[in-house]
């Protein structure tokens, strides 16, 4: 009876990617995002069936009745971790925690590609926002994710010092050779197209 099979490729991958995040079956972990539109529940069911390890709820502003309802309904659907946001206040974080999230994304408008502050007139400096959210998330054992505003390596340190458990990097990595995306040649320079979570097309 065959109990398992290990190939040379498996050994090479383990050596090359020793820090890869894998589940108990050795599969790479994968999170998937759903919006808050009418079909979010069907999409979430399909993603969970496909093996998504976590569900991210994408919304420009996370402290809304709609987002709270979506979190509550997804919590009934699955025990997979739910990540929601974005919020910038302790009150917003507290409401998301009550709704059933395991992690909260912090930041309204600090990202290099984000226009939420300009369009809606709502936002808060990222350091202050992280402190606000962490003040209620940390005691509750909920992960704090700093989303946006990371332009220099020092910004990562500042986010962690403010209370974030981890940071999301978009624009900082989007222009690297390793990142996916169409290369655009303009005035003798190379650029890459990249998109924000809630945008269909965005310039680089």
Give residue spans per PLM region.
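Alpha-helical transmembrane segments of multi-pass membrane transport proteins
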Residues: 30, 183, 188-192
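Active-site pocket-lining/capping segments in soluble small-molecule metabolic enzymes
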Residues: 195-196
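Alpha/beta enzyme core
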Residues: 2-9, 13-144, 153-166, 171-174, ...
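Conserved small/polar residues in nucleotide/adenosyl-binding loops
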Residues: 200-204
């Amino acid at each position: 009876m065959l109990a398992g099979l290990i190939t040379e490729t498996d050994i090479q991958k383990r050596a090359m990617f020793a820090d890869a995040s894998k589940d108990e079956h050795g599969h790479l972990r994968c999170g998937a995002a759903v919006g808050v539109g009418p079909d979010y529940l069907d999409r979430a069911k399909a993603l969970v069936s496909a093996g998504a390890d976590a569900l991210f709820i994408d919304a420009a502003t996370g402290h809304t009745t709609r987002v709270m309802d979506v979190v509550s309904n997804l919590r009934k659907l699955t025990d997979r971790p739910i990540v929601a946001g974005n919020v910038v206040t302790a009150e917003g974080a507290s409401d998301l925690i009550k709704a059933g999230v395991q992690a909260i994304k912090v930041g309204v408008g600090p990202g290099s590609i984000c226009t939420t502050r300009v369009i809606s007139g709502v936002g808060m400096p990222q350091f202050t926002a992280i402190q606000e959210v962490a003040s209620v998330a940390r005691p509750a054992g909920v992960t704090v994710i700093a989303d946006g505003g990371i332009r220099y390596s020092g910004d990562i340190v500042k986010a962690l010092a403010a209370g974030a458990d981890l940071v999301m990097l978009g624009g900082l990595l989007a222009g690297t050779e390793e990142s996916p995306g169409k290369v655009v040649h303009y005035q003798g320079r190379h650029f890459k197209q990249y998109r924000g979570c809630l945008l269909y097309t965005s310039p680089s």
